[in-house]
Amino acid sequence: MLHPRARTMLLLSLPAVAIGIASSLILIVVMKIASVLQNLLWLRLPGTLGIAQDSPFWIIAILTLTGIAVGLVIRFSQGHAGPDPACEPLIGAPVPPSALPGLIVALILGLAGGVSLGPEHPIMTVNIALAVAIGARLLPRVNRMEWTILASAGTIGALFGTPVAAALIFSQTLNGSSEVPLWDRLFAPLMAAAAGALTTGLFFHPHFSLPIAHYGQMEMTDILSGAIVAAIAIAAGMVAVWCLPRLHAMMHQIKNPVLMLGVGGFILGILGVIAGPVSLFKGLDEMQQMVANQAFSTSDYFLLAVIKLAALVVAAASGFRGGRIFPAVFVGVALGLMLHEHVPAVPAAITVSCAILGIVLVVTRDGWLSLFMAAVVVPNTTLLPLLCIVMLPAWLLLAGKPMMMVNRPKQQPPHDNV
């Protein structure tokens, strides 16, 4: 016979697995539709019209039209496509299900149109809202927080293709003063994360790792170098943190969301013309292209890092629906490659991983997630001790500093005031 603790853990196992699978399937469907639309907008359509897909005219036109289209969705859809991601954490309160269709459409348009945001925040919002709404009907005795945790864990597993990230994140959020052991509380979320990761793996494998030269033995000087790189990345990220609320307030002086997002899309188009197509989209595939292109110089990497960070701030401030983690990873990779080109004596594995750690820490203020992203992009077990040590001064630098989030005015409703 099972111990009562084991029976308690098994109680939510089936719902956890179902939520993990559903979270992954929603992500897969959204990404597939966005991929088809992206192929149409950036390959087939310009080819049919005889226009180069990387021409300045096409980049500006598509991003401007994308902004207008997203603005129309936010203006006229029920629930106004959910909350403004610039004002929300990654894992937030559930939104009304009526806002989800508009949110999904706005996300797909942004992903396909080349906006420099990832899918993580809207997908998380959709999955949490559905899990809470359906779970409350089927098992009303389970509280909303449990459904929120299961949905967020399943989504994290699906996004990163592994339950490890969920285990790291929830090991700190669920580690309260309760007498219930931590792993008892982690059991159901890890089931959801594992189900989400395995389901994603059946259809595609998220490819984060980069072909960067292997890092050998750690030396004391490497710790200092890594800490300096992380500090540089944090400094760059804090510039974006300073700019985001100010640009957000400036953009939201335009009361019409169609015009506001149209202007935002136009600015993104200008930035895309300056840095080229590799600076567009969420950044994961593009960072692979960036590493593979041996022709990039130090100034090219610097330009890509600056433009991508600026595009991230503009997209978030304009009200596009998307997450900030994936483009931040791109910024970290570009910054790390730039620093390696500038100081070749410091291995690229150190500069890239520590730059990712620093910039993701600024964006998420989550040490475990920052370590995870640095470790999966530059998969080298020798780097893990160095990253853990570099995390300490990086965390000190950010202690008490503002987050990359806009404080919503008290009089503003939960959704965009349109």
From Swiss-Prot:
Its main location: membrane. SUPFAM superfamilies: Clc chloride channel. It is a multi-pass membrane protein. The chain crosses the membrane at residues 10-30, 54-74, 99-119, 120-140, 149-169, 186-206, 223-243, 258-278, 300-320, 322-342, 343-363, 371-391. It is found in: Cell membrane. Keywords: Cell membrane, Ion channel, Ion transport, Membrane, Transmembrane, Transmembrane helix, Transport. InterPro entries: Chloride_channel_YfeO, Cl-channel_core, ClC, ClC-type_chloride_channel. One of its GO terms (molecular function) is monoatomic ion channel activity. GO terms for cellular component: plasma membrane. Belongs to the chloride channel (TC 2.A.49) family. PANTHER family: CHLORIDE CHANNEL PROTEIN CLC-E (PTHR43427), ION-TRANSPORT PROTEIN YFEO-RELATED (PTHR43427:SF9). This is Putative ion-transport protein YfeO. It comes from Escherichia coli (strain SMS-3-5 / SECEC). The gene is yfeO.
